[in-house]
Amino acid sequence: VLPYNKMFCLCKIRNPFAIFTRKKRGFSSDKNFMVDGIDITWKDTVQFAFPINGGRVIKVYDADTITIASKLPYDNSPLYRLSVRLHGIDTPEIKGNDVTDDEKIASKNARDFVSNLVLNKYIRLENVTSEKYGRILADVYIGEIHLNSLLLKDRYAVSYDGGKKTKPKSWLHYKNTGEI
């Protein structure tokens, strides 16, 4: 055990929570790096995509985020727990500072709809990439049913391209009328 004066102490840092922020300090897309003896830039790299094409749904957090259990395509792969966000859609949020009662009700309805379709079932993933929070981003299929499109068609979701979200003033009104 180190004596107190030799231990790392967050109290010496002006803003100790700054070490947990997501700011990209020191990031430059035109800076060169050496990787395995090769001089590269950010643009020479590609975003990682999980080598996965499906799994069994073990949790439905909300209508656009599920958790699957799956192995990776190599011998003796352990069974991984992976968070998957449905590509191209946004659904009502269950939690958050600005979540209204209307949105909570709509969110639970949408989550229950998805849960009844996919929970404990095998789903297929297509167009697999990663999204900004590290989750898998994919088109989800149950048999031949494209879940992402079904949620849009049945008005449990709105289109979302990864940028600024445009959500309905009332999710329940949107579900009934289609008016955003």
What are these regions (language model features)?
Residues 3-180:
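Small beta-barrel nucleic-acid-binding modules, primarily SNase/OB-fold domains
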